[in-house]
């Protein structure tokens, strides 16, 4: 239990991730112990952590989705990342809805943030040519953005226009925003 609490004190983790960490620890420290006993002890610790609220896959997924969205990750990239943590599709969908709740077009906002971070499209400092445009298009597409969003970001002429588009995409029309 100490190892689990120490790990969860340092890192946010899903149930599956905690199982993996405890399994590796047990394999390293308890090599002579029966695997069935180790698995049982690991399950007991994980169940106790769940009961005490130390791990919550829904909250973990929501926090990860919000953080990834702020970094400019596409919905596809966020889904793949959360699947690596062995989270179910329902939890992932709910996390994405929570992360995108206050934004009209969160995918567009994420694409603009990605372009800004990678200096693509209007954020590019050099002289844009056709080859550069193809490279930028490929970079956005590999990041999981649709071709329509890629074209919109790259076809915008100025940074000011793109920032206005980002503000429009972020406004949900709800009072208080």
Residues covered by each model-derived region:
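An alpha-helical, amphipathic repeat domain used for nucleic-acid recognition
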Residues: 1-177
